[in-house]
Amino acid sequence: MTLTACEVTAAEAPFDRVSKTIPHPLSWGAALWSVVSVRWATVALLLFLAGLVAQLNGAPEAMWWTLYLACYLAGGWGSAWAGAQALRNKALDVDLLMIAAAVGAVAIGQIFDGALLIVIFATSGALDDIATRHTAESVKGLLDLAPDQAVVVQGDGSERVVAASELVVGDRVVVRPGDRIPADGAVLSGASDVDQRSITGESMPVAKARGDEVFAGTVNGSGVLHLVVTRDPSQTVVARIVELVADASATKAKTQLFIEKIEQRYSLGMVAATLALIVIPLMFGADLRPVLLRAMTFMIVASPCAVVLATMPPLLSAIANAGRHGVLVKSAVVVERLADTSIVALDKTGTLTRGIPRLASVAPLDPNVVDARRLLQLAAAAEQSSEHPLGRAIVAEARRRGIAIPPAKDFRAVPGCGVHALVGNDFVEIASPQSYRGAPLAELAPLLSAGATAAIVLLDGVAIGVLGLTDQLRPDAVESVAAMAALTAAPPVLLTGDNGRAAWRVARNAGITDVRAALLPEQKVEVVRNLQAGGHQVLLVGDGVNDAPAMAAARAAVAMGAGADLTLQTADGVTIRDELHTIPTIIGLARQARRVVTVNLAIAATFIAVLVLWDLFGQLPLPLGVVGHEGSTVLVALNGMRLLTNRSWRAAASAAR
């Protein structure tokens, strides 16, 4: 069909309207100025420059001393307060050490050097705050995208506008072209393209139709969508992103904990060394001023400021970057564990495959007792509350065939075994071949030999039929598996509860040579533990309830975004985009973060060692010591902030190909 100019304009109008309604972030300059430490650091810098100009132009000494002292107050009051609070808690931190060094510089008449120290120290602190703020704001800004109101469709078909926060699971809402989606849900009717870059990082709108999942805060395109709310507003993907970032910021990495453990001892040792540098030369008749100058220089250059900033900013930046691209990482500890991955263990259904299996065959054991239609009806009734992809496929096929699905009660899913429920007065079970304990069934052999997945339907404990289901490999599976193999010490291993034939069929197509099939959940745990006992750091990737125990046992675990709730809670990370190629990418990003941490620690240690040796065995000028020490701190902070950029994500994705 050819669109007229009017039709083209109408089709594009919603996206134009959305661009005006979505809140734009502050400009870079305004965002910087909103950080308190940036404002004080700027004031300190201006006062320092004013004092320097006055000093160089021969102004009265009282003038430039006053300006430098004002610089002390503007740039140093925050650090002085933090240091005092630490001292009250019987701790010694770098803030107090820097203030002590600056005061010492004033005491020996080196107010210029002390003011320079204050300015650079305040600047490095502001950079750290900017990194932390940007890490949080890059993700928390998503909350601003969630609309305040929603249009609920009531039982009589009328519409009512309510607050989005009042929506409950099961509510039906309508989203018109250009509107933002008010809650996580599923499409009941309608079709449209949804711009979900704010959640998944996808650059192009994604086609949505009946049954597809949508996220709160994403933007509807040119069609009208009728949705059912599937998550409470407090549990939407957007809300979980914010919660996970907050948790990640509060959870310190192992490297950071080690640094903090030795920081107190190091600081006390440094103070003792500074006192020794003062007392010992004076005992041998040295002049006070040069002794104090050397000691103050030592205190400045030996302070572990850059070491303290070396670890957490890069890790938190990596977490924020991953979150912007649809991967939620729950803590800095997880980033370190992902970087250590030496083997990836993959589930099959819903992870390596699309997770949208299709019911291929319905085989009643005795058509005179239960025909194919009744068999599928009972199976769908038992599975209608299931979260497993196989269960959803059975229900979907029954609906496609127009079969009325009766209500069921007392539903229970047994991981790795199947489900059972009471359908009317009938006790219906859907069992896997591995958990089935009845007489051998001839109907299983052709299904299993073809690589299909079989499900046995039992009525009151007696087998009445066999269902055959097939699944499709994810489009990016082959490339992703190859990338994982290239990144890790060992190629990926496939862990599945499915039969060996089905597992090997999928594995061969994906390029996997190590397959462990027909595993119950506890057997998956055993395989993971055996791999780790052999020296591997296992990353488990899965989506089903039966993957949760193995995820808990693995070194790290990532859940595919369409997975069951228990799996999402157990995993260390979640891929919202539900795309397998994000797994090698997040491993690559974690390794980038680890390299940045290593480089930062090397930079910090090198600067400290060189400057300390120069001061002890040479004549290190105090201004040069200040610039060298604080310059390394600024350099470390800026290096960590590199991981916030899209370029870092693209580099990780390229390395994973």
From Swiss-Prot:
Magnesium listed as a keyword: yes
State the active site.
D347 (4-aspartylphosphate intermediate)
Pfam families attached to this UniProt entry? E1-E2_ATPase, Hydrolase
- Which residues lie in coiled coils? none
Which reactions does this protein catalyse? Ni(2+)(out) + ATP + H2O = Ni(2+)(in) + ADP + phosphate + H(+); Co(2+)(out) + ATP + H2O = Co(2+)(in) + ADP + phosphate + H(+)
| Binding residues for Mg(2+) | D543, D547
Broad class of enzyme this protein falls into: translocase
Print the keywords alphabetically: ATP-binding, Cell membrane, Cobalt, Magnesium, Membrane, Metal-binding, Nickel, Nucleotide-binding, Phosphoprotein, Translocase, Transmembrane, Transmembrane helix
Give the membrane topology. Answer: Multi-pass membrane protein
EC annotation? 7.2.2.-
Where does it reside? Cell membrane
Q: What does this protein do?
A: Involved in heavy metal homeostasis. Probably exports nickel and cobalt ions out of the cell.
Stated name of the protein: Probable cobalt/nickel-exporting P-type ATPase
The gene name reads ctpD
